[in-house]
Regions:
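Bacterial N-terminal signal peptides that target proteins for export
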Residues: 1-8
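Intrinsically disordered, low-complexity regions enriched in serine, threonine, proline
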Residues: 3, 19-20
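Bacterial N-terminal signal peptides
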Residues: 8-16
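Periplasmic polypeptide-binding modules associated with outer-membrane biogenesis and secretion
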Residues: 21-445
Length: 445
């Protein structure tokens, strides 16, 4: 069964089947062997071998086969979605029939990776081997159109059933939220509870393991899933290294090791409830110390003013997490001066021989924006007039992105008493006039 996540897929499969047939000659000898398939030649594809295509076609060398069988084989290959065109021809003689399949591979842009979310009983290599024996054309990439994703799902279900493992295989099509472009197909086992008992970090030192275990404490008892573990590794675990100068640390795909159940536990929990030890491998890499920080591109604000905001002392482990926080402070400073589109990009220059890193902080200041129109909504006439009178940032003055918050903090006494307010501030940038219109909206709770 296929569930679609944020992506509507219109399956449209176009391929042609052209036939060039040379009929067998007359005579008894030819009638005996003419339909025996003795050879298959595959041309046009750069992704698949003759053996893989033959296995996927459903044909077998040595079987009796005729034109109808070849049409079905081409249809089967075309329906997979892996070929944009499929053409066949054959010739027959007294020795048998020779078939040629001319294929055109589907463009790589129409293929997406397949991921296996929670098949904790298998390694990736074991799954790939099991799949390729059942779906010969499977090579980690799947077409966005065609039936191959379904064939893979059916094969995975067959593997589970054969090994007497619980669960039902399903898959999700993942797409980018901004464009609905399909990015991956994610297979997972449903109708089984797989909970994390503990988390291991092969590759980490004992000191690092202690820090990682603390950072990953929310995983204990959580549902096992590779996507969620990858998110935790990126958001919670990687900063453990980045804070300490391990700027090239990387986490690999997670695996799960099934915790053996006693007979009593298995009877109590049932086969559809499992515990696993999650395994998240890490490669820490070198620890880098800061050798220097250099500002580039800043002119509206002097280097002497922004330098104290950066806490990257030379000779100390480079704290990339702190650097991002510091750059956010610099960004806020620029916005308080009216530079609303400022961009600051750190460029790390590594010296692996010395285990040091030098940062160039590249500033694109953008244009100076000025105060535009002020709109206050949701208040009665008198309260609105009081608030507008208290607003001192006038049209045409350099905009200060800090001002709206400070204004609201200082003018609470001007609002009607006895009312709790939800207050939202919306800034609208006019790129042509280089102005900022401010809307402050009040809503009674």
């Amino acid at each position: 069964m296929n569930r679609v996540a944020r992506f509507a897929l219109c399956l449209s499969l176009l391929f042609s089947a052209a036939v060039a047939q040379k009929h067998p000659g007359s005579g008894k000898a030819s009638s005996v062997n003419a339909y025996k398939l003795i050879a298959v030649k595959v041309t046009g594809t750069e992704r698949y071998t003759d053996k893989e295509v033959l296995a996927a076609s459903g044909l077998q060398i040595g079987q009796d086969a005729a034109d109808g069988d070849f049409k079905e084989a081409v249809q089967r290959l075309g329906n997979s979605g892996l070929f944009s065109n499929a053409v066949y021809s054959y010739s027959s003689s007294s020795a048998g029939t020779k078939l040629e399949l001319q294929l055109a591979d589907t463009d790589k842009s129409k293929l997406v990776p397949a991921y296996f979310e929670n098949f904790v009983w298998f390694t990736d290599d074991e799954l790939r081997t099991a799949l390729q024996s059942r779906v010969p054309l499977f090579k980690q990439l799947l077409p966005i159109a065609g039936n191959l994703p379904d064939r893979v799902s059916e094969a995975l279900q067959a593997v589970l059933t054969e090994r007497q493992f619980p669960g039902r295989v399903d898959y999700l099509r993942h797409a980018e939220e901004s464009s609905d472009t399909l990015t991956a197909i994610d297979y997972r086992v449903e109708e089984v509870s797989i909970r994390i008992r503990s988390v291991e970090f092969p590759g980490a030192s004992p000191e690092q393991t202690a820090l990682l275990t603390t950072a990953a404490r929310q995983l204990t008892g959580a549902e096992y899933g590779r996507a969620s573990l990858a998110a935790v590794a990126r958001l919670d675990l990687l900063p453990v290294y980045l804070q300490r100068g391990y700027l090239k640390a990387a986490f690999g795909p997670a695996d799960g090791r099934v915790v053996p159940q006693s007979s009593a536990a298995a009877d109590a929990q049932g086969p559809a409830e499992l515990q696993v030890d999650a395994i998240i491998p890490v490669t820490p890499g070198k620890m880098y110390s800061t050798s220097g920080v250099h500002w580039k591109g800043n002119s509206a604000i002097a280097t002497a003013e922004v330098t104290p905001l950066i806490h990257m002392p030379a000779g100390q482990p480079a704290d990339a997490v702190r650097l991002l926080r510091d750059l956010d402070s610099v960004d806020k400073l620029y916005r308080s001066r009216g530079y609303m589109t400022v961009r600051i990009k750190p460029d790390a220059q590594f010296d692996d021989g010395k285990s040091t890193v030098h940062y160039d902080l590249n500033v694109v200041e953008g244009d100076l924006y000025k105060m535009g129109e002020l709109e206050i909504a949701g208040l009665d006439t008198q309260a609105r007039a009081r608030m507008q009178g208290a607003w001192t940032l006038r049209e045409g003055q350099p905009y200060n992105a800090d001002y709206p918050k400070r204004f609201l903090d200082d003018t609470g006494q001007l609002l009607p008493r006895g009312v709790r307010w939800d207050i939202s501030v919306h800034e609208s940038l006019d790129a042509k006039d280089k102005t900022v219109d401010v809307e402050i909206r009040f809503k009674q709770q």
